[in-house]
């Protein structure tokens, strides 16, 4: 049976102690000073008990007296001290010196005294040793009725580990969610038919019909890409009826393509018409107008696996494969339209409408007509334009380990573990997977040259494995340069592949590998493998070490059982037994426990009847239960009571022994009991081997995503936000939304006059321009006045002006009437005022008599000259305002005439006083 290393060392120590009985050792566990003090204390006790020469004088024939541990009264004569203290369950931390007859024992160093640090330490040591078994065991000699044997060595397990650990370079591939993207061009004519009701001052749409018509192949090739022109008519079929729309309801003619308004994030576009035809005419008449806008719009197209259709950025679906054509077997691709709706042009030179030039290199151009538009795109073969797999991560250090029927690829850089089968995955099974081998070889070659070119060798070719979760792993095994022989073995394994198997793999139908959107399972697998590897290696090493240790210790057990069979049998059977060798087996008998208080030790190991011979183990007296008679025996090993007292040896000088007695030890010196010790008083040498377990190392996880947000966004064919954005920007790019056409009732008249004069030829056009200009000016003036009067603020202003004019006319009329009645009073109101109020000193008649006729004539002349001066100043002022030369000359001529007219009657100054007259 398996035992611990500590038990084995205990057996070895027991063997050493047995060997020491034949050659007594002079060593002890205490220092010289302590042994000296103990020896002095012991000698004082011996002197009090009449022990001489260190040998107790015990009559050989005298029977053993009654055993007791209580102190005996002093004796008058010398008696042999035959009793040692009784083994008890007292705390071993307080050892007692045996009380001899007639002697009061001295207090020992461990006696109860006031608080002392040494005593506290002793008590603690006593508590530590109190857990040992204090019982004694009586083991009868085995008779052979029960025999046992030791088990044979067991086979030890192997460490759980992976097989064929291989390092290498790996490139992981995932499912390609991104659709195939290419540039396409839409050709169509936007047809708008509007029905307008014209009122006198307003227009009202009665109906607006909008439609899209595809452009024929010939017009696209010859006119649009040939000359950058487009026809003004649109011929298309609706409800199985062929119809034709004419731009501006005029005859067919060519229109030039002009660039559309640019918008951020959109491709280029061209069209022919910015303003739509809105028919207007005389009031209260229904009119209809047609607009045809030829549009060439570059858009982005997308197609996803299996590439049977594609969708344009406008949201329009085309139910044909982008790889359909008439070259290289592409006619087998899907096409849901009739044959006459598709045309493939070889050697086509497309026109760049931005620069007006045609491309220098020819292309194969596909044209497909749908009911609403014609779409064109550059044809390309399906292989290698698309690939169902795309490269995910490059792993320079990938470890491959074989676990059972699977490979586990572990990468610390990714913190992930991928599980695959042991068999390789053929690339021929991947539909449209040509890019996998090419990209894998390029990445592996680059990593190998950068990192492993001088230290490792490649083992065979690149291997491919399909991992759980839909990841395809391209793995290149590597070997260090000193393992070239393994490289040769790997080459032999590669060459051992049967040709039939290779042919079978090459003809396997291809399929698409579906990859999960999350890699958390690989992260969990990596975590589990990381913990499993650490735990399994730790416990595996422990199991192997434990097994090997048991097998090695079994040899020691077989040898130790020959020396002390009882100890080996007791430890093995986990109970106290007595054993002896019967050939190659152990005969055992069960030991009976004896309470410690029923065991008494004698304090002398000398044999009185045989001088020079002593017992090698102390003598005991015991009884199984209280009330029975005492039985004699000898202390054996490990508290065993031997019923025979046959353990003797020649007496030697300087004898010192420690014997396990109950829960402590007893010390004999010169074959005489000295004192008792606790187990804690003896320094223990530990045989325990510490188990050094390595703690689990820390590992940080890094974020790892299979598909980015942009890849997930691009995985769908239709982007609702992009479609709505493009459709709402269509009106801004291909129409003028800022120009406003208002209702004009005279537009019909002008249109009729314009048509009339246009029919008269060049002369009619010239006359028509003059007539239309004059009529337009008159109409504009009348319209302006009419619109001003129709405005409430204008009418209010006119009313205020009229009212102000009436008030001014009234005051002017009054002034004129005053001038007619009394000009002087009107002109000189202050002068005439004195005439109405004469001076207080004179009467009226006398005043009238003061007027002189000559002075009156002079007054009349003065008034006349004042009128002339006023007229000259007005003429000069008007000439200055006009600022012209003719006006200035006219003013001067007028001045000369005025001066000449007034030359005869010269003006003379009036005298200052009446006396001067």
Curated annotation (Swiss-Prot):
Lineage: Viruses, Duplodnaviria, Heunggongvirae, Peploviricota, Herviviricetes
Pfam family, one: Glycoprotein_B
Residues in compartment: Intravirion: 814-917
Residue numbers covered by motif Golgi targeting: 865-868
Internalization motif (motif): residue ranges: 907-910
HAMAP family: HSV_GB (MF_04032)
The protein, known as: Envelope glycoprotein B
Subunit organization: Homotrimer; disulfide-linked. Binds to heparan sulfate proteoglycans. Interacts with gH/gL heterodimer.
Organism: Bovine herpesvirus 2 (strain BMV) (BoHV-2)
Function: Envelope glycoprotein that forms spikes at the surface of virion envelope. Essential for the initial attachment to heparan sulfate moieties of the host cell surface proteoglycans. Involved in fusion of viral and cellular membranes leading to virus entry into the host cell. Following initial binding to its host receptors, membrane fusion is mediated by the fusion machinery composed at least of gB and the heterodimer gH/gL. May be involved in the fusion between the virion envelope and the outer nuclear membrane during virion egress.
